[in-house]
Curated annotation (Swiss-Prot):
It is an enzyme of class 6 (ligase). Keywords: ATP-binding, Ligase, Metal-binding, Nucleotide-binding, Queuosine biosynthesis, Zinc. Binds 1 zinc ion per subunit. Zn(2+) binds at residues 197, 205, 208, 211. The gene is queC. One of its GO terms (molecular function) is ligase activity, forming carbon-nitrogen bonds. HAMAP family: QueC. Its cofactor is Zn(2+). Pathway: Purine metabolism; 7-cyano-7-deazaguanine biosynthesis. This is 7-cyano-7-deazaguanine synthase. Its EC number is 6.3.4.20.
Length: 237
């Protein structure tokens, strides 16, 4: 995938601080220039909220994105229903069915809420594009990462915004995880600053869905993951 510098418009990037969103942000910077990007981070009551926010700030700084908005949406914790936001639901180890069923780490309709905030901010900034690093294939099977979800969401955005010219773009949605790593390496994405683990903030656990998918992706790309993992996976440090 060859990335070329595009127009001089503005864009908003939904930046969690994870691997996919960081590659997506790097793409957006290549397209628009860091000075025309707004980076949005949402702390929604997830277990690793503090570590993810730290990663967001570090990634944005490395990429030169100065326009940033970090918000909190505590209602996800009140709603519950996900291992990421409900302390009574354990984060499971990745199983053989990874990607074939919706896991307990799915946060109900989360991406719709994140995008709603991104659209609101985009209207204020005058941005015409919203980048989100959703991945449909080789992923955890979340329903709000499907292409048809974004097609429907864009229709709502066109009908529900003042100018109707804001578009949600998903440049990674058809890529495999190892292809995302390869693209990120090609672009110089700061993988060393990212955080993907669902359960730990000191070092990555290496066994949750997110960690396993990430480790497989780096292995598939023939690269070494630069983030620290728990001692039992010391060989991946």
């Amino acid at each position: 995938m060859k990335v070329q510098r595009g127009d001089t418009g503005k864009a908003v990037v939904v930046l969690s601080g994870g691997m996919d969103s960081t590659v997506c942000a790097t793409l957006a910077v290549r397209e628009y220039g860091a000075e025309n990007i707004g980076a949005l981070h949402v702390s929604y009551g997830q277990r690793t909220a503090a570590r993810e926010k730290q990663a967001f700030a570090a990634v944005a700084e490395r990429l030169g994105i100065q326009t940033r908005l970090a918000v909190e949406t505590p209602f996800f914790r009140a709603i519950g229903g996900s291992a990421l936001t409900d302390a009574n639901i354990a984060v499971p180890d990745a199983g053989e069915l990874i990607g074939h069923e919706i896991p307990v780490t799915y946060v109900p309709f989360r991406n719709a809420h994140l995008l709603a905030m991104a659209v609101s901010w985009a209207e204020v900034l005058g941005a015409s594009k919203i980048y989100i690093g959703a991945v449909a294939q080789d992923s955890s099977g979340y329903p709000d990462c499907r292409p048809e979800f974004y097609e429907a969401y864009n229709l709502a955005v066109r009908r529900g915004t003042k100018a109707g010219d804001i578009e949600v773009v998903t440049p990674l949605i058809a890529l495999r995880k190892h292809e995302i790593v390869s693209l990120g390496l090609e672009l110089g994405a700061p993988f060393d600053l990212t955080w993907s683990c669902y359960s730990r903030e000191d070092c990555a656990c290496g066994v949750c869905d997110s960690c396993v998918l990430r480790l497989r992706a780096f292995e598939g790309a023939g690269a070494v993951d630069p983030v620290p993992y728990a001692p039992r996976l010391a060989g991946h440090d």
